[in-house]
């Protein structure tokens, strides 16, 4: 798990709907379900928040990184 996900787990321990909101967004089914579970009790909301965080891990955008070729004819080129 990424450090951002661990931070969300820490937030979920205190306020589960806030962690789900930060992870999935405001107008989502996950937030509505978590809020309803949180109204039923703290532990159902916590378990659902941990489930949402683990099912949707943080992924860095690797499209902004490009790999350089190993051939010598491209030495010094940027593309």
Curated annotation (Swiss-Prot):
Return the GO cellular component terms, semicolon-separated: cytoplasm; fungal-type vacuole membrane; lipid droplet
| Keyword Lipoprotein recorded | no
Q: Which UniProt keywords apply?
A: Lipid droplet, Membrane, Phosphoprotein, Transmembrane, Transmembrane helix
Q: Where are the transmembrane segments?
A: 7-27, 33-53
The PTM Phosphoserine maps to: 71, 77
UniProt superkingdom: Eukaryota
Tell me which parts of the chain lie in the Cytoplasmic compartment: 1-6, 54-79
Localization annotation = Membrane; Lipid droplet
Provide Vesicular-side residue ranges.
Answer: 28-32
- PANTHER family attached here? HYDROPHOBIC PROTEIN RCI2 LOW TEMPERATURE AND SALT RESPONSIVE PROTEIN LTI6 -RELATED, PROTEIN SNA2-RELATED
UniProt name for this protein: Protein SNA2
């Amino acid at each position: 798990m990424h450090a951002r996900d661990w931070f969300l787990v820490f937030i979920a321990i205190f306020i589960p709907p806030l962690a789900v909101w930060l992870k999935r967004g405001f107008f989502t089914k996950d937030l509505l379900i978590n809020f309803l579970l949180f109204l039923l009790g703290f532990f159902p909301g916590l378990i659902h928040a941990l489930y949402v965080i683990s099912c949707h891990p943080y992924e860095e955008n690797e499209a902004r990184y490009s790999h350089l070729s190993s051939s010598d004819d491209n030495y010094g080129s940027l593309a």
